[in-house]
From Swiss-Prot:
Transmembrane segments: none
The organism of origin for this protein: Desulfatibacillum aliphaticivorans
GO cellular component: cytosolic large ribosomal subunit
Organism lineage: Bacteria, Pseudomonadati, Thermodesulfobacteriota, Desulfobacteria, Desulfobacterales
InterPro entries (UniProt xref): Ribosomal_bL27 (IPR001684)
Region entry Disordered, spans: 1-25
Name of the protein described by the UniProt record: Large ribosomal subunit protein bL27
Length: 84
């Protein structure tokens, strides 16, 4: 009698959804106050002029204006919003 034993179960086959982090508004773009500029973990990019930071390190514009990414010293980056 031909029999087939039960196959073992795989321990793989799961994946979580992405967190949708990253830059949301690039340099040169016009933004409104409250627009999210960057979603990040920790301060990879620091807030500059007219940019606020949320509890989860999200950077957002505090005024209407134009986005500019700048260097802050040798190894840090910051994002600012300047009035147009």
């Amino acid at each position: 009698m031909a029999h087939k034993k039960a196959g073992g179960s795989s321990r793989n086959g799961r994946d979580s959804n992405g967190q949708r982090r990253g830059v949301k508004r690039y340099g040169g773009e016009i933004v409104r106050a409250g627009n999210i500029l960057v979603r990040q973990v920790g301060t990879r990019i620091h807030p500059g002029e007219n940019v606020g930071m949320g509890r989860d390190y999200t950077l957002f514009a505090t005024i209407d204006g134009k986005v500019a990414y700048e260097r802050k010293g040798r190894d840090k980056k910051k994002v600012s919003v300047y009035p147009v």
